[in-house]
Amino acid sequence: LDISYRELRERNRKLMKILTKGKEIKITTKKGTDLVMNIKGRKCFDDNGIYNKKGSFGNLPSGEVAVAPVEGTTNGVYVVDASFGGFGKLKNPLKIKVKNGYAIEIKGYKAKSIEKHLKNKKYRNIAEFGIGTNPKAKVNGCVLEDEKVIGTAHIALGNNISLGGKVSVPLHLDGVIKKPTVWVDEKKIMDKGKLVV
């Protein structure tokens, strides 16, 4: 909580500008993440911690920008190696294979337990892509803070209504990824966890 919200707002503003104009996101990691998603026309969410207008909202600690990928467009694999919603800090990575916007295969740490929560196909929807922007947040197993850590990205399954998506289900599970490389329309915005914009 003890951060410069002015600096956070500026960091978020730069990312928001790129994501709002963007059409496609690609994310990779050394651990095997290689995922592509369409975000054309999607509004971005700016969690900058400044809630001074009527109707504004967010959560604390703040520090992320996020977008709901267009349903049915995400393909590839992502490897969660920090934490996963409802399961906390991961002892070993979790590998999630995605086809046409849905998680079709989950392997690794706690995979069987996670699968039990994903019986409904819509729960497997790729609901969110986000980038952490808080320099003082630390990975501790509480996904609400973990997803804000600068140098991470997160991908969520399930509900995306609050982000302007179309899938309404009673589930939203974030998977936090350390040190990703991220491109928006072939412009690199993060290199192995370091913001380069």
Which residues are covered by each model-predicted region?
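Short, catalytically relevant binding-site loops at active-site mouths
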Residues: 44, 84-87, 110-112, 135-137
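Cysteine/selenocysteine-centered motifs that mediate thiol-based redox chemistry or coordinate metal-sulfur cofactors
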Residues: 123-180
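Active-site bordering "gate/hinge" segments
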Residues: 1-87, 91, 95, 183-192, ...
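Structural motif
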Residues: 24-26, 75-77, 95, 104, ...
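A beta-strand-loop signature enriched in Asp, Gly, Thr, and Trp
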Residues: 100-135
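Active-site proximal loops enriched in glycine and acidic residues that flank catalytic Cys/His/Asp
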Residues: 80-82, 98-100, 107-110, 133, ...
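Short, solvent-exposed amphipathic alpha-helical segments in soluble enzyme
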Residues: 42-44, 94-97, 145-146, 171-172
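Composition- and surface-driven signal marking solvent-exposed, interaction-prone regions
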Residues: 90-93, 108-119, 143-144, 168-170
